[in-house]
Amino acid sequence: MNYEELLAFAGRNPMLSAALVGLTVALIVTEIRRLFRGYKGIKPAELTQLMNAGGAVVVDLSASGDFEKGHIAGSRNAQASAFGPEHKLVANAKQSPVVLVCRSGNASETAAKALKKAGFEKVSVLEGGIPAWQQADLPLVKGRN
């Protein structure tokens, strides 16, 4: 397809062309924002490797009731509304890997931005949260610990 044919197609299909341009711009903006957000999104398999290597602080920002119903082994619970860089779970972990987990990803992303702003170097968010962990057929433990 040459340039003239492309222009002719766009002229015959303005809605389709506008949708293509809009989606392309949205994709570019999303990727640029992801690159500059300051923290890393990791998949369940990456979190498993990080936990097995030791030293990672995994903080589950789910409500305490949801945490007790099922959480990643070794994770600690903190209420999203009370969590910040000074929280006792992460206060001494500025150089350690900190992985934030929640049910939807929203609370984790907000907390990750705050930690990065406070100087934490290795902040990650579990992409897809607990549902992604379950979808990867990885176990959850019940109870408080």
Language-model segments: residues:
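Rhodanese-like catalytic fold shared by cysteine-dependent sulfurtransferases
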Residues: M1-G41, L50-A56, S64-P97, N106-N145
